[in-house]
């Protein structure tokens, strides 16, 4: 290491206790880490340049120092207060025809996360996203879909301000955590019980594309509350309530329901089945409105086996879910990727839909995951138009890389 060479020439590194370096053989990283430990014990005797070199070495050998039991809790502050991570995805989908540019989609996505430690209680985070359609000649567009500041005065309480992701239901059938929420969130979670409240704009909700019900749908503000109970290592039950502040004000809204407010509530659970590797999960969500708007139900239930661990190549997961959504149940929602096609079909055609979802994932290498899904057996019901056909089967496969 050049850093150790500099410190040796400065007569700071003095070798093993017997004053030698054991000949000309190469030192292991753990032996070098032990030298760094000895230098850290004498840090007050080093000059500014030597301390800077030591800090750089401590960052380079952080894993070895941690394995040796050396406390390096302040190391990040010494070598910089910004950490970077990211993921990339290569994806092929066979979609429904609908309003999409083409039935078969081949896309790539790159996301870069930046987390800046402002102080012991505040972290500012951002995420850059660049997506490219490989069947289109256009260049990729890069946006920032996350920028928020999180304050955690203790291990249980938190407050988050800015554009962020929130989780409402257990499965993501109603709201995908990757969706954008612009607002403020405050919560408490002690590992057994959690409560969270938020106020802001759900930018990716289905109604954000809808100019029939709201004149300026993108600016609609909402508030939500959520309660969660944790038990076991990864089992939980939860319930939420979500309400739009603005009433229906679109020019095409029937006068009898103009000004009506729409809200949704839901409850769900994820339950591990002992040491079998199996778990069941599900959600029930009801979207309602006053002034005779009625209600629409959305529910899902499924069985999963295994879990993908990106540090363990060969680890895998399998799952199957059943989904049933009344017409209009998706108004305030933004579902997870592998369920979007059929739910949007029901919304666009004014019909209820029910279908099956099968999915699988496997860690093919460290930090590389192969995922696939297949939506099948879809049926339309309570059709607004009797000529509406059943949705076709859809499927997709993708490679995800974490770094």
Where are these regions (language model features)?
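N-terminal periplasmic/intermembrane-space "pro-region" immediately following the signal or transit peptide
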Residues: 1-89
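Charged interaction patches that mediate protein-protein contacts
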Residues: 62-85, 225, 230, 234-237, ...
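Generic macromolecular interface patches on structured domains
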Residues: 42-43, 49, 96, 124, ...
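Extended alpha-helical regions
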Residues: 203-275
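Outer-membrane beta-barrel pore domains
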Residues: 20-26, 91-103, 134-139, 152, ...
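Short, surface-exposed, polar/charged, turn-prone segments marking secondary-structure boundaries
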Residues: 42-44, 187-190, 346-350
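Outer membrane beta-barrel
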Residues: 81, 87, 93, 101-210, ...
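A generic structural signal for ordered secondary structure
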Residues: 15, 120-122, 127, 156-157, ...
């Amino acid at each position: 290491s050049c850093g150790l060479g500099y410190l040796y020439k400065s007569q700071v590194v003095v070798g093993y206790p017997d004053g030698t370096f054991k000949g000309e053989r190469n030192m292991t990283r753990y032996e070098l880490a032990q030298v760094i430990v000895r230098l850290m014990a004498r840090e007050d005797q080093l000059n500014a340049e030597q301390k800077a070199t030591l800090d750089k070495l401590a960052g380079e050998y952080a894993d070895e120092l941690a394995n040796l039991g050396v406390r390096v809790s302040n190391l990040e502050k010494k070598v910089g207060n910004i950490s970077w991570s990211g993921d990339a995805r290569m994806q092929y989908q066979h979609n429904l025809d609908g309003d999409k540019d083409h039935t078969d989609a081949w896309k790539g996505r790159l996301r870069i996360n930046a987390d800046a430690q402002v102080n012991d209680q505040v972290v500012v985070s951002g995420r850059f996203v660049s997506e490219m359609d490989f069947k289109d000649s256009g260049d990729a567009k890069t946006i920032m879909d996350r920028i928020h500041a999180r304050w955690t005065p203790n291990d249980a309480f938190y407050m988050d301000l800015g554009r962020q992701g929130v989780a409402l239901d257990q499965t993501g059938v109603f709201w995908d955590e990757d969706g954008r929420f612009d607002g403020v969130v405050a919560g408490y979670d002690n590992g057994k019980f959690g409560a969270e409240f938020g106020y802001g704009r759900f930018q990716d909700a289905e109604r954000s594309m809808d100019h029939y019900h709201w004149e300026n749908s993108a600016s609609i503000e909402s508030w939500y509350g959520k309660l969660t109970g944790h038990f076991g290592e990864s089992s939980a039950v939860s319930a939420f309530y979500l309400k739009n502040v603005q009433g229906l004000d679109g020019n095409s809204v029937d006068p009898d329901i103009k000004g009506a407010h729409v809200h949704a509530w839901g409850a769900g659970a994820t339950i591990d089945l002992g040491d079998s590797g199996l778990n069941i999960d599900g959600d029930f969500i009801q979207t309602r409105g006053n002034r005779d708007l009625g209600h629409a139900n959305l529910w899902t239930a499924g069985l999963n086996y295994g879990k993908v661990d990106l540090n363990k190549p060969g680890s895998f997961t399998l799952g199957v879910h059943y989904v049933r959504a009344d017409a209009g149940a998706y108004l305030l929602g933004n579902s997870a990727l592998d369920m979007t096609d059929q739910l949007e079909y029901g919304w666009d055609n004014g019909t209820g839909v029910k279908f099956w979802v099968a999915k699988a994932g496997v860690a093919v290498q460290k930090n590389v995951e192969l995922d696939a899904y297949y939506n099948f057996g879809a049926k339309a019901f309570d059709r607004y138009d009797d000529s509406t056909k059943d949705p076709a089967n859809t499927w997709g496969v993708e490679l995800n890389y974490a770094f």
